[in-house]
Amino acid sequence: MNKNIFITLLISLLLLSGCTGDTCIDPDDFGFIKFNVSARYDPEEITSRQEGNQVAPWRDSAYKVNGYPLTIMVRPWSYILGDKNTSGQLSAWCPWYGQKNNTTTLAAFCVKLQPCTFWDNTRLDMCTPNPANQNDAMISNAPCIMTNGVGLYFLIAAKNTDPNISPDSQSKPQGITQHLGEELTSGYEFYSTSSTGQFSKAGGINYQYKGEDKSKYAQSPLYFKIIDKFYNDNSGQYRLVIKSGVTDTRADPLQFLTDLIKGVLFGKDGIIKKTYQQIIDTSGYRMSVSAILTLYIMFTGFSFLIGNINLTHVELIVRILKVSIVSILLSTDKAWTFFHDYLFVFFIDGVQQILQIINEASATGPGSQSLLGLLISPQTLSKLFSLLFVDWLGFIYIILYLIALYFIFFLIFKATIIYLTALITIGMIIIMGPIFICFMLFNITRSLFENWLRQLISYALQPIILFTGIAFISMIIRTEIYSTLGFAVCKHDFPNLGPINEIFGSFLEDIDPSLGHSIFYWWFPVPMKGGINNFHKANILVPKDHIVVDDSCKNDPDKCKHCAAYECIDERYIELPFLDLVKDAKRISNFINGKFVQLDGILLIFVSIYLLSKFNDTAISTAQFIAGTSGNLTEIQKVNQQSYESAAKQMNRPLNYVAKTVSAPVTSRVSAGKEQVRMFFAEKFENMMMGRLEKQALGSSANKTVQNEVKRKYGIDSKDVKMNAITDYENGIAGLLKNLPKGNELKAKELSQMKFTQLRDKIAANKYGVKDYAALSKEQKAELDKSLKDANLRELASDANFTRDYQDAYKNAHQEMSGRGVGLFGKNIGVLRSWQEIKHRVDTKRKLKEEKRVGIGEKIYAGYTGIKRGVLTAIVGKDLRDAYEGNLTSAEWHDFEYNDPRLRTYSEKLKDDEKAREHEELQMHINKEALAAQADILSPEYLARLEKAGRHSDVEYYQELAQRKLIHEVHGRLFEEGEPVMMGDRFMREKATDSQMRDMIDNAHRKHAEFIDGDRYIRRQEHYDIMHEKAQENLEQTYKELKDHFKRDDIKIEEMPALIAQKVKDTAEGAEIDQKITEELNNFNADVKNYEYSTEVLNKIEDRKQAITDEVNAQIDKINKYRENAKMQTYVKPIVNEGRKLRKLEDHLRNMK
């Protein structure tokens, strides 16, 4: 059970590690915010002030600054060093030669340009927003490309302002603007890992707020813009990485659940507010509060008059306040607003704000603020799995990490359950507020009010104490993750399968250019090898919170400076930015020596997990002790524990949990919902893979093994397929549409998916305004036929359909091989493939043998019950038998299976199952014969070749196999679910009505047409029709020429080669007579061969069509027999196959005389 969960978790995390979209991941990248800023704008976005002076809007990053140092890095880019001009890698722009489609790519002319250099490197600010500076950049080598952030500005907009509200605000925005392309002068550099695995200097900025700006601009929106005077010819983009300084709005794995429940309870129209207002709106409650206030005022006055109380100024003010507070409950408009804004807000929003502060404080470095989000981020997992092949301890570390992740997930989930339980309880307590607030008036009920308030405080403190402990443990775990996995990694093809890597690489680039080179890859550390020469020191921004200990604070640690992430500069290895050169010397030494696995770090993580589990158990009792409610009857800890255990059981044993706790209808709906979601993604992935296989089938990268499988099982040789036929057909249609008056109303791509007859109908309707081709006049038909023939569309359509059939066959063969256990390596390695095929055949035979054994037993028992049933019918009659059959015989064997679409009895179903097994055995035999012949032995083409070779016995044998298989296929199509042509025998004899049988016969006609239209062999008829017509036309022309030349009417086919040669000698002149004779004879022989071959193939296709028709008619005859037995009116509607038998060439020429 737990093993299955662990395996599922491992597979999920492996897949998740491939979702980063980057070729390389920087050492300090544990989930940075990344996006692109384009140098181009849509024309409608730009405002032109005057010639050559355009103003463009600021790009909203959708993030807000949080007051911490704002660190933004601009990715380096160099075409010379191997970076690609794609949206996933490009980080440069060019102020020249851009086109509309260059939003995320450089113009072709700019790709190989050098980076821009400047006459004055201190003046890189081009077209700055400062109105006093409108000078152009001082470029010395134009044309060139801008890199490292030159021309890119960020804007921290002033609160409640919109920099894009007008052109003036776009050019002179309110807020803080800084240029990201300035040379860094603060003693540090940015470094980034390029797509080739090399560390390169990058552009960027580390902006630290001055004075009051930190609080003034906190939570202000962040904008970006590449500033230029003329945008219409720009191309390219900058790829930005925000390392710190913004509030991460990406959802936490468990935050969605928390926000959902909080919104339902405490939202604007939440349950708590509605229930609270319903209570105070109740007339009975208002009367009770009025009575209580009246009694309280009366008792206070009476007690004062008799001297029972001493009303001091303080006591009087307290009593007046009590009366005022309770009186507010009588005001339905102000009651919720008053108590929510001045009391309940501290227990709802106040707790949420404190938790947010705690979470921000625990986020001591890059990555998600949530510990769980950090641990399962694609960047973290990529670095984790990179350890597998660089150190023999890597596998152990990965297993320990996943075990730790498993426990951390459940501990945080348990903490979330505690928090949500406390939140719900707070809501329940607030709902009871209108009742308990009234209890503060009298001494006898005051204790109830005080307990109510204590409970409210207790449940508000629980999540604060709980998440304070989690934050403390989180900081420890974060530090270890940063120190252990704080190195760069890059994708490398692994295993390197040569052309296969390129195939799947182009497949992924079609989806997203940022996805990499191949799906066969693994992450490896950078540098992959140890050695001091592979590590480089530099002054960099330290990427995590730390305390700077220098000479000024050695004696007084309180005076040491605390630096937030990316606030302070220190000398460190750029490959290991989290490790201090002195404190972490041992770990640095391990990395330099090639030891990437730090087991002491994972040990500390497990210690932290143990502490976290203990803290979870004590947090509630601590909150109860502080609030003074530890002795109350409500034991929230037990409630939380029960909630957690139930949820844990659901995760560990989902099937048992659903079966025990949820009713069957709910279970089926949940299962259906899961299946629907699963099928949605499966369908998307399958469509994607099928599209890839379609492209692969027509490309040079097509798998030879799959092509041989297509030839063997589907009778299509890839050599006979015109790979560009679909494109040629579409181009031919497009050319024809240009000559039509309303041709622009049709789309060539859509028409190219149709058959030739459908295409002809569409063009007839478009050109002549009729319904279809049949509605044309004789002259119009002749005109249209001529234009279609001139465009050669019929032949192009035939070739395109043949190519599509080949693509379908390629996909089916690929899937069938995978279904037989022949995987990716088996499709490329013959020995492995043979072993996999043998294993599949053995397994299939074993399965059929077992099914046959079970079927024989069931058949014997069914026969026995049938005898009992017959005897009972003879003794008591049919009606009495039906009444008592359930008790006297095994009725389930002979009664209808109402879950069966054909309403068969179980015994009838057994017979059909036996036929299905016979079909499987027949298919295995056919596959064996096809494997021996290395061809599709049932295809008309193969049978025609055997016929021509004189192997008549083989033809008869294979035709007999084809006939048996065809009968099974026709039955399968006629009896398939939905609208079966024939129901069970008992139903047809006893229950079927006249209208049902008529519908069955009509349905048989429809399915016959569908079967004929979809049969993969019959679909080739158009291809061979064209071949036959061309050969016939050429031969008739040759025969006519010979007839006219030699004045003979009795020319035989065997004479024609000699007569052709003589005719060429009689009519041709020059030295090339022999060459022309050879050419004419070759053409004649090719025409004869094509005629005879196509004639034989077409006759075989007609035989197949007739066999299908005969079998469907046999089923129709059966239905009519049932009708006759039931004394119903005759409804005979057989199918007539309008086939043809083509004559041999000798007979055809003889008929021409």
From Swiss-Prot:
Record carries keyword Cell membrane: yes
InterPro entries: Conjugal_tfr_TrbL/VirB6
Main localization of the protein described in the UniProt heading: membrane
Lipidation (S-diacylglycerol cysteine): C19
Coiled coil: none
BP GO terms, sorted: protein secretion by the type IV secretion system
Signal peptide location: 1-18
Keywords of the record: Cell membrane, Lipoprotein, Membrane, Palmitate, Signal, Transmembrane, Transmembrane helix
Ranges annotated as spanning the membrane: 289-309, 393-413, 422-442, 457-477
Lipid attachment residues per UniProt (N-palmitoyl cysteine): C19
Membrane topology reported for the UniProt record: Multi-pass membrane protein; Lipid-anchor
Disulfide topology: none
Keyword Signal listed: yes
Subcellular location: Cell membrane
One Gene Ontology CC term in the entry: plasma membrane
Family: Belongs to the TrbL/VirB6 family.
Protein name: Uncharacterized lipoprotein RC0146
